[in-house]
Amino acid sequence: MKIAIDARTLGSRPSGVGMYLNDFLKQLIKYEDMEFVLISDVAESEYIKSFQNKGIKVYTQGKKVYKSAGVYSYFTFVKKQLELIKPDIFWEVNTIIPVKLKGDYRIMITIHDMFPIEYVEYFGRVYNIYFKHNL
């Protein structure tokens, strides 16, 4: 089974979600019946390089994603990579997918924070709309 993963949170300076992915992936790569492919904006961190050294392919956009608007351009890149990689599963670790993905693969999303969904009044209208339309 081929699993493509959005590893952007692991690309440069991982914290929180990036470290979650790092720890989870270190365990998953022990399963020989799974092939992993990472997609990232950049591959600068020691963590992502350690997966490259273990033979995991990493496809990078070549420029860091800094702002929310940059995520849309990044996902255009992700969409193209998924067409080339042809995974069985695409795993989005970052909660949102801002573009419509189509393909012969299943999509798995990890939701780390339910507060914006459950307690809308604390996050404001813009964040609420962004979260709802990108999930």
Question: Which residues make up each language-model segment?
Answer:
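Carbohydrate transferase catalytic cores enriched for Leloir-type hexosyltransferases
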Residues: 1-135
